[in-house]
Amino acid sequence: MESFVDEVAIEVFAGHGGAGSVHFRREKYVEFGGPDGGDGGIGGNVVIRPNLSMYTLDKYLSKRKFKAQAGFPGVGDNCSGKKGEDLVLFVPLGTQIYDEETGDLLFDFVSDSQEFVVARGGRGGKGNAHFKTSTNQTPRFAQPGEEGEYKFLRLSLKLLADVGIVGLPNAGKSTLISKITDAHPKIAGYAFTTLSPNLGVVKRRGDIFRFTIADIPGIIEGASMGIGLGLSFLRHIERVKGILYLFDASSLDIEEDLKMLRNELSTYNPELLNRPYLIVLNKIDIWNDPEFTKDVIAKVSHLGKVVAISADQEVNLEELLENMDEVFFKNEIEKILNPIKDTKPISLDESDIFES
């Protein structure tokens, strides 16, 4: 079973350039042919690409050093050596590549069509054919190939989810994501069941529109400072378009809980408070009283748009999804349902008018 690993350091070595050749022509009736040593091949590059089937960096725990193939040496008849084969490393979409020595962000994978050449292979050495001069007709030396680039990298994964579910421990985040997506997180009736983010895909409008949703481990006061499971997973909601603040509807003070959660997000990254959000009251099946549910909603409605659900009993889940469509994805869905035709205006330029 995969373990969720979202940060790891690795070393990569591009391929060494191939050596130039020391070689001389062998011609009939020519005792000493001229130099014809070919150049060495370029070393292979180290290339990083995203893989949509990967959700963790755990494969890089067992192996931390990676080296591309060296370029092949040159040969006679001025033939260059073959280029070394590139080494391709795959990472989950959302992975950021940092230079571990400088801390600089080198690349951010936000599209599955991207590719990043992180280390380039060394140039091949020149063969002895390059070194023939009027005073040295038979050079017996060639250049060695150059070293390939070396990089010490930190791979840091930030999930590319459209919606993030944020809540206290045991609010029902994993149950909710299991009901509205095809994800199958571990679910239990105790705090901190979720020890790593879960990612699922929500299909809407007959599957013409999809979005991804992630739940992160429960947040407690001080999470942004490392308390509880800490800030290690907060970065996975940095890219979301919208946030669901999920609460156990029987909480004694939902307003204070919301204030605490938003304070933790703000301490970690103030930009998160600018994301649109919904307040979701879960577990309303506990009392099974519609009027009481209305009273609970009324008490917190001044905090934002509120939806009351029971994830476990699948109550009001469609209402929740409709609100998510409206609050988070209204423009995107409208563009899909009502595409604008690309029409060109009729030209009234006199030059376009011809007499028959």
UniProtKB/Swiss-Prot annotation:
InterPro entries per UniProt: G_OBG, GTP-bd, GTP-bd_Obg/CgtA, GTP1-OBG_CS, GTP1_OBG_dom, GTP1_OBG_dom_sf, OBG_GTPase, P-loop_NTPase
Keyword Nucleotide-binding on entry: yes
Subcellular location: Cytoplasm
Domain of life: Bacteria
GO cellular component: cytoplasm
Pfam family, one: GTP1_OBG
Cofactor (UniProt): Mg(2+)
Domain spans labelled OBG-type G: 161-329
Entry keyword set: Cytoplasm, GTP-binding, Hydrolase, Magnesium, Metal-binding, Nucleotide-binding
Enzyme Commission number(s) from the entry: 3.6.5.-
Function: An essential GTPase which binds GTP, GDP and possibly (p)ppGpp with moderate affinity, with high nucleotide exchange rates and a fairly low GTP hydrolysis rate. Plays a role in control of the cell cycle, stress response, ribosome biogenesis and in those bacteria that undergo differentiation, in morphogenesis control.
Family of this protein: Belongs to the TRAFAC class OBG-HflX-like GTPase superfamily. OBG GTPase family.
Description of how the protein assembles with itself and partners: Monomer.
This protein's name: GTPase Obg
Native organism: Leptospira interrogans serogroup Icterohaemorrhagiae serovar Lai (strain 56601)
